[in-house]
Regions:
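ABC transporter NBD signature
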Residues: 24
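Conserved nucleotide-binding/hydrolysis modules and their immediate coupling elements
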Residues: 1
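Conserved helix-loop functional segments at active or binding sites
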Residues: 37-41, 59, 71
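GG-anchored amphipathic helix commonly corresponding to the ABC/SMC/Rad50 NBD signature/C-loop
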Residues: 5-6, 10-13, 18, 27-48
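Conserved D-loop-proximal element of ABC-family nucleotide-binding domains
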Residues: 17, 42-43, 55-63
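Pre-signature/interface helix of ABC/ABC-like ATPase nucleotide-binding domains
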Residues: 17-21, 108
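Walker B catalytic acidic pair
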Residues: 51-52
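C-terminal lobe/lid and adjacent interdomain/linker elements of RecA-like ASCE P-loop ATPase modules
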Residues: 4, 60-153
Length: 153
């Protein structure tokens, strides 16, 4: 076999079409999550890395993606690079990756956050987030914890 072409029918009643030609950013994110989830079931993958799997999605779909990734994390380590508050709220541990310039060189810093509420609030409202973002972040984290607790029962 020299090559493989994925065919997809993203909507009911549509014929199969080449994935690479028709898929949007959000559809690609969901496709890759589903594909990695299937592979994880048949492969002995200890760690799965998702780099901005939330690109092109929002609202209810972002919550579904967050829950799917949480489900995956029950059996293996998940590392996710995200800018999506709902996905960040679902995480057990947060690392803040930042860059700085020193002596004409760019340095990358990785810091484990002890309290990630402010970081989730920053994802909600930007660097200068309002006082309303923190309670919202706390609510998102509480909802995420309830979801994770429901998986244990």
């Amino acid at each position: 076999m020299d090559s493989v072409e994925f065919m997809i029918s993203p909507n009911v009643g549509e014929p199969l079409k080449p994935l690479a030609k028709i898929i949007s950013g959000g559809e690609m994110s969901r496709f890759m999550l589903a594909f990695k989830n299937i592979l994880a079931g048949v492969d002995d993958i200890g760690t799965m890395v998702f780099d901005e799997i939330d690109t092109g999605i929002s609202g209810n779909i972002s919550q579904v993606v967050s829950e799917k990734m949480c489900n995956i994390s029950r059996a293996r380590q998940v590392i996710a690079v995200t800018h999506m508050p709902s996905l960040a709220a679902m995480a057990d541990n947060h690392y803040l990756i930042s860059k700085s310039t020193q002596n004409g060189k760019t340095l990358t810093h990785v810091d484990l956050l002890q309290d990630d509420t402010d970081e989730v609030a920053r994802l909600i409202g930007g660097n200068d987030y309002s006082i309303y973002a923190v309670p919202h972040a706390k609510e998102m984290k509480a909802n995420a914890q309830r979801y994770k607790d429901s998986l244990i029962k």
